[in-house]
Amino acid sequence: MKEVTAVVRPNKMSVTKDALDKIGYRRMTAIPVLGKGKQRGISGELNFYIQPKLLAKRYSTGMKYIPKRLLSIVVNDEDVDQVIKTIIGVNQTAQIGDGKIFVESIDEVIRIRTGEKGELALK
């Protein structure tokens, strides 16, 4: 099993969720996060108003953190490539700020309610 963690634009979360749902991955964890990278705070991505004087200041000093969504999905090994392709397919704009995907091995999954382990806990 693998954990696929993606950091995506907030405005892409709905289409990402729908695309993953279409390939059978309805279970996921999504968390609003703040981060920074090469993008350095493109204001067009923000969902709230920024006062013009603060916007002017941002261009001179750079915004420290911008809103993103962190999406975590535990998948079977054979589904990792399909999940990654799906996430890239709906999030790739060829612009700085499209996000990142991380893949890590998961040793065990246990459903708390039933005690089921492994692939049974993912169903």
From Swiss-Prot:
Annotated Gene3D superfamilies: 3.30.70.120
Presence of the UniProt keyword Transcription in the record: yes
Origin superkingdom: Archaea
Gene Ontology CC: one annotated term: cytosol
PROSITE patterns: PII_GLNB_CTER (PS00638), PII_GLNB_DOM (PS51343)
A single GO molecular function term of this UniProt record: ATP binding
UniProt keywords, alphabetically: Nitrogen fixation, Transcription, Transcription regulation
S-adenosyl-L-methionine is among the record's keywords: no
One GO-annotated biological process of the protein: regulation of nitrogen utilization
Function field: Could be involved in the regulation of nitrogen fixation.
UniProt family annotation: Belongs to the P(II) protein family.
Name of the molecule in the record: Nitrogen fixation nifHD1 region GlnB-like protein 2
The species this protein was found in: Methanosarcina barkeri
